[in-house]
Amino acid sequence: MLYPEYPEYDNFNESGALIKVVGVGGGGGNAVNHMVMNMVKQEMGGTFVGESSLTSEEHGRIVFYAVNTDAQALRKSQVQQTVQIGGETTKGLGAGANPNIGRKAAEDDQDEIRKMLEGADMVFIAAGMGGGTGTGAAPVVAKIAKELGILTVAVVTKPFTFEGKKRMQFAELGIKDLSQYVDSMIIIPNQQIQKVLPKNAKLIDAFAAANDVLRNSVMGISDMITSPGLINVDFADVRTVMSVQGQAMIGFGSAVGEPGAGRAEEAARLAVRNDLLEKIDLSNAQGILVNITAGMDLVFEEFNIIGETIGSFASEEATVVVGTSLVPEMSDEIRVTIVATGLGEIAGNEPIQVVRQGLSTQNIEGEGRVNIVPELHRRESVEVSRTASEEYQRPLDKPITDRLEAFKKNNFFNPAQREEN
């Protein structure tokens, strides 16, 4: 029997795969800042390259970067490694909600971006879509990562509906542009935040919860490939699954209770199911990565139930990888992390998948709850007039309809034509 051929991967050094997390623009930068601060406070994750004492050799390496046209935002960033782009075009004042300027800024500093990405085995690109730098520059960063052969996952947001149709249109076009270069993309609509959090939730808490999605996504995959387990998941497994292009989903479920079918079913249900995701078809997932983390009391029945639950929505040709980590300190708890990829082509008018996380501390007989939060809020740059060139000049009072025409003129909507010009 001949088995299908898979690409060969180099052996990784003992310190583990190098993961780089790049926040592009205001929203992406905020998400990465949030992750850095939480890692410092909780001392979780791998070898944190930055101003921290996180040096656990049991985890892989994670390096953080902030990329922005806004010099002030970079100065305030908690991320030690920053890359300012488009200094000549923007004078350090931001892209003014103009993706064309964000794109040109990144293209002007491609060499710096390339240096930033070199050496990485996997890159997460975080960005808010619909504004200037995130929408315009993130595809350029992803394209360079692709040229370097780096496994690349984008975690992006779409605007609130009250921000207008034009901003949403820019976001959808930016997502379409970005999708050409990433291996997988996780898209979260900011509008979901009002459906998840209580009405009296504080704004700062809402955005903090939203930014946890990037942190959980990065740490979930990092823990999969770096934590020793009874059944290990290595980076080659992650690459095989995440390389299935299209929409992706990362889910987290946790349940507490006596070992047995009850808590396993609960954790798996929380990881794969939520009413807010009913428009998303998981039945055709082409790649599935599962990691089960539990104490020494994990029983075979639980392992089998979780596997069957996950397998129920996989396509017949799907690549399914299941890993298991036993943590002696965990008592009565089981956690399930799921990565599903190849869920369909990414298009602006397609239903959007949501990254979700679940936690159940109820007795198994009771109903658990699913906690789903949208990810990344954006930090608006101050709108300013551009004087670097007539092509990218945008006065403060220029109507958005005129800006849309300018986008079309400069082939923002057609990446292929942009490359030919």
Curated annotation (Swiss-Prot):
Subcellular location, record wording: Cytoplasm
GO molecular function terms noted in the UniProt entry: GTP binding; GTPase activity
Principal place of residence: cytoplasm
Alphabetized UniProt keyword annotations: Cell cycle, Cell division, Cytoplasm, GTP-binding, Nucleotide-binding, Septation
Residues at which GTP binds: G26, G27, G28, G29, N30, G132, T133, G134, E163, R167, N211
An individual GO BP term: protein polymerization
The UniProt record lists the keyword RNA-binding: no
PROSITE patterns found in the cross-reference section: FTSZ_1 (PS01134), FTSZ_2 (PS01135)
InterPro entries per record: Cell_div_FtsZ, Cell_div_FtsZ_CS, FtsZ/CetZ, FtsZ_C, Tub_FtsZ_C, Tubulin/FtsZ_2-layer-sand-dom, Tubulin/FtsZ_GTPase_sf, Tubulin_FtsZ_GTPase
Pfam families per UniProt: FtsZ_C, Tubulin
GO cellular component labels: cell division site; cytoplasm
Chain's role: Essential cell division protein that forms a contractile ring structure (Z ring) at the future cell division site. The regulation of the ring assembly controls the timing and the location of cell division. One of the functions of the FtsZ ring is to recruit other cell division proteins to the septum to produce a new cell wall between the dividing cells. Binds GTP and shows GTPase activity.
Description of how the protein assembles with itself and partners: Homodimer. Polymerizes to form a dynamic ring structure in a strictly GTP-dependent manner. Interacts directly with several other division proteins.
Name this protein carries in UniProt: Cell division protein FtsZ
Organism: Haemophilus influenzae (strain ATCC 51907 / DSM 11121 / KW20 / Rd)
Taxonomy of the source species: Bacteria, Pseudomonadati, Pseudomonadota, Gammaproteobacteria, Pasteurellales
